[in-house]
A protein has these predicted regions:
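C-terminal substrate-recognition "lid" of short-chain dehydrogenase/reductases
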Residues: 163, 198-227, 232
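Short C-terminal tail/terminal secondary-structure segment
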Residues: 2, 81, 221-240
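Substrate-binding pocket helix/loop in short-chain dehydrogenase/reductase
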Residues: 82-84, 88-93, 190
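Alpha-helical segment proximal to the catalytic Tyr-Lys
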Residues: 112, 155-159, 218
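Residue(s) in the substrate-gating loop at a strand-loop-helix junction
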Residues: 126
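Active-site loop immediately N-terminal to the catalytic Tyr-X3-Lys motif
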Residues: 84-85, 131-137, 159-160, 197, ...
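Active-site helix of classical SDR
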Residues: 107, 142, 150
C-alpha cells in the first residue's frame, strides 16, 4: 500500500524506531517521502525530552531541504498499571514529560520548517485520551494532553496553512504492548470489548496517520481520529 501525494515530501517521525512509528516510516518511504527517524535508537540518538537534540535535527533538515512537509510524533511511553491512589507522582511526571512535553518540543523545534512548506503534523494519542482505561491514570492524562495540544496547534497554525491532527489508537500489537497480549485473560477481555473483535496491527494505525499527513486530508485539521476497531463507538452487539 502507498498513499498518494507524498512523493518527494520530507518527513520526520519521532519514535520511528519501533512499533507504530516504524510502521509510519515504512509507509512514508513506500509513498515516496524522504523520512528522518528521531528515536533513542538512532545515531545520534534523539530524545524528545531533549530540545537541543531536536533543534540539531531541525537545523539539519533546514540545511538539506529548506522545510518540512510532515511531522509525526509517535514517541511515547507507558508506565506501570496502578490505581490512582497508589500512583507515584514521578510516574505521572514521566508520562507527561515524554508524551506531552516531548510532542510539544518536536512541534516547536520543527514549527518554522512546517510553516515554510504549509506542512502537516500528526500526533499519536490513544483511545485512552477518549475513554479512560483502568489503572492507567498517568498515561490517560498524558494522552488526553496530546489530544488537547493537537487541537490548540490546529487553531494556532491554521493561519500558516499547517494542519494538525491526531490518531487515537486502540489496542495495538507493538513492542510496548506485547507483554499485555501474552496474558490470555487480558487479550480475551480486550477483544471481547472491541466490536471488530481483534487486536490491531501497527500498519493499520500507520495507514490512518499517513493519510492525515497527506494532501488527501487537506481539509482536515484539529481532529482526534479513533483507530480502535470500534472501541469508542460503544459496546459490541448484545445477544438479544
Amino acid at each position: 500500500m502507498t498513499i498518494d501525494g507524498l512523493d518527494g515530501a520530507t518527513a520526520v517521525v519521532t519514535g520511528g524506531g519501533s512499533g507504530i512509528g516504524a510502521a509510519v516510516v515504512r509507509l512514508l518511504e513506500r509513498s515516496g517521502a524522504t523520512t528522518y527517524v528521531a528515536d533513542l535508537g538512532t545515531a545520534p540518538p534523539v530524545d524528545v525530552t531533549d530540545r537541543e537534540a531536536l533543534d540539531t535535527l531541525a537545523a539539519r533538515m533546514e540545511a538539506e531541504h529548506g522545510g518540512l512537509d510532515v511531522l509525526v510524533n509517535a514517541a511515547g511511553i507507558l508506565t506501570q498499571n496502578l490505581p490512582v491512589d497508589e500512583l507515584p507522582a514521578d510516574d505521572f511526571r514521566r508520562n507527561y514529560e515524554v508524551n506531552v512535553i516531548g510532542t510539544l518540543n518536536a512541534c516547536q523545534a520543527f514549527g518554522s520548517l512546517l510553516r515554510a512548506r504549509q506542512g502537516a503534523v500528526v500526533n499519536v494519542a490513544s483511545q485512552a485520551a477518549l475513554v479512560s482505561l483502568p489503572q492507567q491514570a498517568a498515561y490517560t492524562a498524558a494522552k488526553g494532553g496530546v489530544a488537547a495540544l493537537t487541537r490548540s496547534l490546529a487553531i494556532d497554525w491554521a493561519e500558516h496553512g499547517v494542519r494538525a491532527n491526531a490518531v487515537a489508537p486502540g489496542f495495538t500489537l507493538t513492542p510496548m504492548t506485547e507483554a499485555f497480549f501474552q496474558n490470555e485473560t487480558f487479550t480475551r477481555a480486550a477483544t471481547g470489548r472491541i466490536p471488530l473483535g481483534r487486536i490491531l496491527e501497527a500498519d493499520e494505525i500507520a495507514a490512518a496517520i499517513v493519510f492525515l499527513a497527506s494532501p488527501l486530508a487537506s481539509a482536515i485539521t484539529g481532529v482526534v481520529l479513533p483507530v480502535d476497531g470500534g472501541w469508542t463507538a460503544g459496546e459490541p452487539a448484545l445477544p438479544w
